[in-house]
């Protein structure tokens, strides 16, 4: 192996150590800070061996210059308010991946990607940290994940930190406000008094139907057929022959005599006049003028032949 490439190798031990999933060896803590800054110009090589160690090295820069450059980057990191983090995970299948993100606020976000060996999906995890909680190295990060093979959860999981925290906070506040408004409306609706009942609402516009349903289907609405007796029909026919139009006084008198109401007598006379006109058009009945003259002649003859009109024997 080339000596120039061996001078700048970084060794990261990946094992099941709980929260210390991303911890360099002692003496290489300042080199870890250099990863967040600009890298040296050269081709870096990544390799891992069978015991689960990942090696990162460069081959185009001397060891002393590279060490000085990394120390400068570490000193520059002390004055920065936020840095982008690199999360490295290693699984038993030999597949490695890492993700970085620069935060716009002082909070620090760490992103990790885990490949599920059983499914083709990818497990994404992002957690937020504050700069005040970070030390000179990332050994105590609580968001790192390092487990045995097959320990990666099967279901996809996604959690956003950093810039998404403000958005999630605003979204939760907006949702709470909407729920409060909707609950307030429901409360007002429940507490509202019942509607006032006006007098015109109490009036029954449609009187109850007293007619029975016909044997063969329903009849017209609000139509009550009056069944007249033979005596009632005879008296009404006699009255119709004398006068086709009744005065109100005569109508009331006939209704009281026949045990009917005024409306029933009025409607019967209307129907009888329509029936008479229909018969006259068809020629089945004599004209009304001829009938009236015959009735007048008959009345005059009966009056002249009455016993009261005959001369007395004393005269």
From Swiss-Prot:
Keyword RNA-binding listed: no
Coiled-coil ranges per UniProt: none
One Pfam family, short name: Homeodomain
SMART domains reported for this sequence: HOX
Compartments, as annotated in UniProt: Nucleus
Domain of life according to the entry: Eukaryota
Signal peptide extent: none
Composition bias, Low complexity: 302-315
Record's keyword terms, sorted: Developmental protein, DNA-binding, Homeobox, Nucleus, Transcription, Transcription regulation
Gene3D superfamilies from the UniProt entry: Homeodomain-like
GO cellular component, one term: nucleus
Ranges annotated as DNA-binding: 221-280
Sequence motif: Antp-type hexapeptide, positions: 197-202
GO molecular function per UniProt: DNA-binding transcription factor activity, RNA polymerase II-specific; RNA polymerase II cis-regulatory region sequence-specific DNA binding
Record-linked PROSITE patterns: HOMEOBOX_1, HOMEOBOX_2
Region called Disordered, residue ranges: 177-200, 272-315
Family: Belongs to the Antp homeobox family. Labial subfamily.
Function: Sequence-specific transcription factor which is part of a developmental regulatory system that provides cells with specific positional identities on the anterior-posterior axis. Acts on the anterior body structures.
PANTHER family in the cross-refs: HOMEOBOX PROTEIN HOX-B1, HOMEOBOX PROTEIN ROUGH-RELATED
This protein's name: Homeobox protein Hox-B1
Species annotation: Cyprinus carpio
Name of the encoding gene: hoxb1
């Amino acid at each position: 192996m080339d000596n120039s490439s061996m001078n700048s190798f970084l060794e990261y031990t990946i094992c099941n150590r709980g929260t210390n999933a991303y911890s360099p060896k002692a003496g290489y803590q300042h080199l870890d800070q250099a990863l967040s800054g600009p890298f040296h110009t050269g081709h870096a090589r990544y390799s891992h061996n069978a015991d689960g160690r990942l090696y990162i090295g460069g081959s185009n820069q001397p060891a002393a210059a590279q060490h000085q450059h990394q120390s400068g980057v570490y000193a520059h990191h002390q004055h920065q308010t936020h840095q982008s983090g690199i999360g490295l995970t290693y699984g038993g299948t030999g597949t490695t991946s890492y993700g970085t993100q620069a935060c716009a606020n002082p909070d620090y976000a760490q992103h990790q990607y885990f490949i599920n060996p059983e499914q083709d999906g990818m497990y994404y995890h992002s957690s937020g940290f504050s700069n005040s909680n970070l030390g000179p190295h990332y050994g105590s990060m609580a968001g790192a994940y390092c487990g045995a093979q097959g320990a990666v959860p099967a279901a996809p999981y996604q959690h956003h930190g950093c810039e998404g925290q403000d958005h999630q906070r605003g979204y939760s506040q907006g949702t709470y406000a909407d729920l409060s408004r909707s609950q307030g409306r429901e409360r007002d609706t429940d507490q509202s008094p019942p509607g006032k009942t006006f007098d015109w609402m109490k009036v029954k516009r449609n009187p109850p139907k007293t007619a029975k349903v016909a044997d063969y289907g329903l009849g017209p609405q609000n139509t009550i057929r009056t069944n007249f007796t033979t005596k009632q029909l005879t008296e009404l026919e006699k009255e119709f022959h004398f006068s086709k139009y009744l005065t109100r006084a005569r109508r009331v008198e006939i209704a009281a005599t026949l045990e009917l109401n005024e409306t029933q007598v009025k409607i019967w006379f209307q129907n009888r006049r329509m029936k008479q006109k229909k018969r006259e058009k068809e020629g089945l009945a004599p004209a009304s003028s001829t009938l009236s003259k015959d009735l007048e002649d008959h009345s005059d003859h009966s009056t002249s032949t009455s016993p009261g009109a005959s001369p007395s024997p004393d005269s």
